[in-house]
Curated annotation (Swiss-Prot):
SUPFAM superfamilies: Chaperone J-domain (SSF46565), HSC20 (HSCB), C-terminal oligomerisation domain (SSF47144). The lineage of its organism: Bacteria, Pseudomonadati, Pseudomonadota, Gammaproteobacteria, Moraxellales. Belongs to the HscB family. This is Co-chaperone protein HscB homolog. Residues 2-69 form the J domain. Co-chaperone involved in the maturation of iron-sulfur cluster-containing proteins. Seems to help targeting proteins to be folded toward HscA.
Length: 172
């Protein structure tokens, strides 16, 4: 049984994330080790459910998993050789490093999301045409942007922490 089947979802890049979450919570309850007669087996199943959920939750890992189902996921860890992309990626990283406000981070997030949306469209075309080399390249780019989104989240958290500690200092 693949991850999509586990959560009763179509084998596709576009999935209903609310259904994924709902089915995940239901399966978590069903296979919770504390409620099972065979705790070891329930622990294994629970771990599989958690891993499948993590994989399907993010578009980059979901795309990579789709390639894995077609046995086309080899060399996904190779570096990206698209010079224009690398140049844009470097500029984006510099903008993130220089971001000092929530507004700047929001703008950056929107830009990254636009990149991701474009790459998702590219992946769907590559996947449907079975252009595996291009699909793998697109997954590599999606992974890069997912990491940037994660770093934006961290930067936002850091800004909030800094603002909170600054507000505390104002009270003294």
């Amino acid at each position: 049984m693949n991850h999509f089947e586990l959560f009763n979802l179509p084998v596709a890049l576009d999935i209903d994330l609310a259904s994924l979450k709902s089915n995940f919570l239901s399966l978590q309850q069903q296979y919770h080790p504390d409620k099972a007669a065979d705790k070891d087996q329930a622990l294994i199943k629970s771990s599989e459910i958690n891993q499948a959920f993590k994989t399907l939750s993010q578009v980059d890992s979901r795309a990579a998993y789709l390639l894995a189902l077609k046995k086309q996921d080899h060399h996904l860890d190779q570096s990206i050789s698209d010079f224009e992309f690398l140049q844009s990626a470097l500029e984006l990283r510099e903008q993130l490093d220089e971001a000092t406000s929530s507004e700047h981070l929001r703008t950056l997030r929107l830009e990254v999301q636009q990149w991701i949306d474009g790459l998702v469209r590219e992946f769907k075309i590559d996947y449907s045409e079975e252009d595996w080399s291009e699909a793998r390249d697109t997954v590599r780019k999606l992974r890069f942007f997912q990491r940037v989104l994660n770093d934006i989240d961290k930067a936002e958290d850091q800004l909030l922490d800094d603002e909170d500690s600054f507000d505390l200092d104002d009270d003294f």
